[in-house]
Curated annotation (Swiss-Prot):
Molecular function per GO: RNA binding
Keywords: RNA-binding, Transcription, Transcription antitermination, Transcription regulation
Gene responsible for this protein: nusB
Family classification: Belongs to the NusB family.
Name of the featured protein: Transcription antitermination protein NusB
SUPFAM superfamilies hit by this protein: NusB-like
One Pfam family of this chain: NusB
Superkingdom of origin organism: Bacteria
The protein's role, per its UniProt record: Involved in transcription antitermination. Required for transcription of ribosomal RNA (rRNA) genes. Binds specifically to the boxA antiterminator sequence of the ribosomal RNA (rrn) operons.
PANTHER family hit by this protein: ANTITERMINATION NUSB DOMAIN-CONTAINING PROTEIN, N UTILIZATION SUBSTANCE PROTEIN B-RELATED
An example Gene Ontology biological process: transcription antitermination
One GO CC annotation: cytosol
Length: 167
């Protein structure tokens, strides 16, 4: 998936006024790293170190960022295999941004069971609204909803009590 596209910079972080939470910033930074990995084929460790040098990194949840970036890249092939049946085209045909968002959401559904799937999907939708194409958030929502039905069926039948700190 090599490309000459430039890596989209993380938006809305200057000053972080009104920033929703540290995990959202961690997801945005992980998105940037996964995107960079997809379009450049760069080394995961180097990408992670580069992103940790941005001036606002201290505002993010560093361990969560590292878990997302390293986890997605380590399990990318398996995650893509889980995503593919729910797509209307080959995963290689997705935009790198939307593919990265789907990888993050799928990783969280599989490897972060303490995070409610609705929170995972909502965060992915917000990433797609900020960084994806015009209707990318609708596509991401549809794919992750289908994945949640398979990966988190019990949770969907019996949703956990709402906890604002879990997402």
């Amino acid at each position: 998936m090599m490309s000459t596209e430039t890596v989209p910079p993380v938006k809305r972080v200057q000053g972080h006024k009104g920033y929703k939470n540290r995990r959202r910033l961690s997801r945005e930074l992980a998105l940037q790293g996964i995107y960079q990995w997809q379009v450049t084929g760069g080394n995961a460790r180097d990408i992670g170190m580069q992103l940790q040098q941005v001036s606002f990194f201290s505002k993010a949840d560093g361990p969560y960022f590292s878990d997302l970036l390293q986890g997605v890249l380590e399990h990318a092939a398996d995650l893509q295999t889980q995503i593919q049946p729910h797509l209307d085209r080959q995963i290689a045909e997705l935009s790198p941004v939307e593919c990265s968002i789907l990888l993050i959401g799928t990783y969280e559904m599989v490897y972060r069971p303490e995070i409610p799937c609705r929170a995972i999907i909502n965060e992915a939708i917000e990433l797609a609204k900020s960084y994806g194409g015009t209707d990318g958030h609708k596509y991401v929502n549809g794919v992750l909803d289908k994945l949640a039905t398979r990966l988190r069926a019990v949770e969907l039948q019996h949703p956990p009590a709402r906890n604002k700190d879990s997402g």
